[in-house]
From Swiss-Prot:
Residues 1-43, 96-101, 117-130, 180-193, 256-265, 339-364, 409-422, 471-501 are cytoplasmic. Glycans are attached at residue 314. This is Cystine/glutamate transporter. It comes from Homo sapiens (Human). L-glutamate binds at residues 135, 244. It catalyses: L-cystine(out) + L-glutamate(in) = L-cystine(in) + L-glutamate(out); an L-alpha-amino acid(in) + L-kynurenine(out) = an L-alpha-amino acid(out) + L-kynurenine(in); N-acetyl-L-cysteine(out) + L-glutamate(in) = N-acetyl-L-cysteine(in) + L-glutamate(out).
């Protein structure tokens, strides 16, 4: 059984409860008649669902540094093969999540699926690492790319000061947090616009590339599978780069409870998004190779800029703006989705209860959104973020593979469970095996980094027993926790979701 939030013996519930009109009694607001229930609304349509998936998948990587795959494959042909295979494998994972999302109709993504199938301990470990390290570090990394590229047009002749990048990055992070705190609808609308910008940027690269092919610029595709020798032990790293570029297909499942008609919308949004992204990624890489050879691509710090300078002339100045908008879209979509993960984990008693509360008027999970802000700022101004993400990249695929393996378990354990969308069993089997295979080979290829990541992940086990299992916490601690919760409720104007009261 999942341990539910502890109900205080000191005060009634330990937190302030909103009245039927969604008002905190301590705020002294006059109650307007017929106000909506305080709960998250189903505002994610098919278009918004597609924009969430595409908007979070396509970040800066495809524009800045798709060379990670090429470095670890050794040839143009093998790199394009890896891009295609990673797209197909990501589609398999996404289809598996489509079945999980339409069978277990709860928000939270892999946290929820692991919780339902394998119990609270592995689910807690997943959200523990996500909250404290992975999500703040990942948000800081993509935000730094935003900061760098939004400033690039103003520093054409000189190096951009590192402090300026971090300051504008901090502003961008704050804007995203405020946007997601204030309105679900506006956040979704802006995500649609930013997704359109991403696809426009990709088309700006693909169309000239196709024209180059028509003109016969195919010299870089001759002997496509010959090139630098690359050990088979480096292929997992190529897959990591490829799969990382496709990461984001699972984010719609984080907001299942806010999706309109999820039984139809989730599978359809996933299929549309993955088809667009896979075709777009492969064609973008093909376009690069029509103008840039393998050696030049490996030396370039911003492949899209190099490509556009050669083919688009002065229009290449617009490329950094498109890259910055692409990064901003990934920031926005990631915060929108992951805040629901923290919201659900809090609702299940695995995070502080304030994180499962909703703003009485905006109907947004305000605390679950803003908790990321200080953590991301700490990551932004400290440490080597890339190394930290490398340490923990295996954990993402380990838990995603575990969640998809849970689908197979449910097929045999609960064969009569209602499944509006069902995939052939070989799809989740192949995907979960691939995830575990990548984790095993990463341990073989880079045991030091993977070992550090494994140790960091395991810190969630003692944390689980300390914060979740241990019920007999000191009275002073419980009193202090409740005072903090009530104070934050008043400041933030949040209450528990009405159906949970």
């Amino acid at each position: 059984m999942v341990r539910k939030p502890v109900v205080s013996t000191i005060s009634k519930g330990g937190y302030l409860q909103g009245n039927v009109n969604g008002r905190l009694p301590s705020l002294g607001n006059k109650e307007p008649p017929g106000q909506e229930k305080v709960q998250l609304k189903r505002k994610v349509t098919l278009l918004r669902g597609v924009s969430i998936i595409i908007g979070t998948i396509i970040g800066a990587g495809i524009f800045i540094s798709p060379k990670g795959v090429l470095q670890n494959t050794g040839s143009v042909g093998m790199s394009l093969t890896i891009w295609t295979v990673c797209g197909v494998l990501s589609l398999f994972g996404a289809l598996s999540y489509a079945e999980l999302g339409t069978t277990i109709k709860k928000s939270g993504g892999h946290y929820t699926y692991i919780l339902e199938v394998f119990g609270p301990l592995p689910a807690f470990v997943r959200v523990w690492v996500e909250l404290l390290i992975i999500r703040p570090a990942a948000t800081a990394v993509i935000s730094l790319a935003f900061g760098r590229y939004i400033l690039e047009p103003f520093f054409i002749q000189c190096e951009i000061p590192e402090l300026a990048i971090k300051l504008i990055t901090a502003v961008g992070i704050t804007v995203v947090m405020v946007l997601n705190s204030m309105s679900v609808s506006w956040s979704a609308r802006i995500q649609i616009f930013l997704t359109f910008c991403k696809l426009t940027a990709i088309l700006i690269i693909i169309v000239p590339g196709v024209m180059q092919l028509i003109k016969g610029q195919t010299q870089n595709f001759k002997d496509a599978f010959s090139g630098r020798d690359s050990s088979i032990t480096r292929l997992p790293l190529a897959f990591y780069y490829g799969m990382y570029a496709y990461a984001g297909w699972f984010y719609l499942n984080f907001v299942t409870e806010e999706v309109e008609n999820p039984e139809k919308t989730i599978p359809l949004a996933i299929c549309i998004s993955m088809a667009i992204v896979t075709i777009g990624y492969v064609l973008t890489n093909v376009a690069y190779f029509t103008t840039i050879n393998a050696e030049e691509l490996l030396l370039s710090n911003a492949v899209a800029v190099t490509f556009s300078e050669r083919l688009l002339g002065n229009f290449s100045l617009a490329v950094p703006i498109f890259v910055a908008l692409s990064c901003f879209g990934s920031m926005n979509g990631g915060v929108f989705a992951v805040s629901r993960l923290f919201y659900v984990a809090s609702r299940e008693g695995h995070l502080p209860e304030i994180l499962s509360m909703i703003h009485v008027r905006k109907h947004t999970p305000l605390p679950a959104v803003i908790v990321l802000h200080p953590l991301t700022m700490i990551m932004l101004f400290s440490g080597d973020l890339d190394s930290l993400l490398n340490f923990l990249s295996f954990a993402r695929w380990l838990f995603i593979g575990l969640a998809v393996a849970g689908l197979i378990y449910l097929r045999y354990k609960c064969p009569d469970m209602h499944r509006p969308f069902k995939v052939p069993l070989f799809i989740p089997a192949l995907f979960s095996f691939t995830c575990l295979f990548m984790v095993a080979l990463s341990l073989y290829s880079d045991p030091f980094s993977t070992g550090i990541g494994f140790v960091i992940t395991l810190t969630g086990v003692p944390a689980y027993y300390l914060f979740i299992i241990w019920d007999k916490k000191p009275r002073w601690f419980r009193i202090m926790s409740e005072k903090i919760t009530r104070t934050l409720q008043i400041i933030l104007e949040v209450v528990p979701e009405e159906d949970k009261l």
